[in-house]
Amino acid sequence: KEGYPMGRDGCKISCVINNNFCKVECQAKWRQSDGYCYFWGLSCYCTNLPDDAQVWDSSTNKCGG
């Protein structure tokens, strides 16, 4: 599984071309994962996630309230 990790506010975690920052963010939530900064979305994107990982989903987006 892969997807955008969420911050406490339910929003995607923003980044500006900083793969190491995103890798740390992903691994803080899911130890075996990897991550990078998705350039077009300017958001962190995680890979190698467990099937039950909760990631940002446009259909259940609660970002911004």
Curated annotation (Swiss-Prot):
SUPFAM superfamilies per UniProt: Scorpion toxin-like (SSF57095)
Distribution of this protein across tissues and organs: Expressed by the venom gland.
Alphabetized UniProt keyword annotations: Disulfide bond, Ion channel impairing toxin, Neurotoxin, Secreted, Toxin, Voltage-gated sodium channel impairing toxin
SMART domains, alphabetized: Knot1
GO molecular function list: sodium channel inhibitor activity; toxin activity
Superkingdom classification of source: Eukaryota
GO cellular component term of the entry, any: extracellular region
GO biological process: defense response
Domain (LCN-type CS-alpha/beta) ranges: 1-64
Broad class of where this protein is predominantly found: secreted
Protein location: Secreted
Disulfide links within the chain: 11-63, 15-37, 22-44, 26-46
Pfam families in the cross-refs: Toxin_3
Entry-linked InterPro entries: LCN-type_CS_alpha_beta_dom, Scorpion_toxin-like, Scorpion_toxin-like_sf, Scorpion_toxinL, Scorpion_toxinL/defensin
Family: Belongs to the long (4 C-C) scorpion toxin superfamily. Sodium channel inhibitor family. Beta subfamily.
Function statement: Beta toxins bind voltage-independently at site-4 of sodium channels (Nav) and shift the voltage of activation toward more negative potentials thereby affecting sodium channel activation and promoting spontaneous and repetitive firing.
Comment text on domains: Has the structural arrangement of an alpha-helix connected to antiparallel beta-sheets by disulfide bonds (CS-alpha/beta).
Protein name listed in UniProt: Putative beta-neurotoxin RjAa4
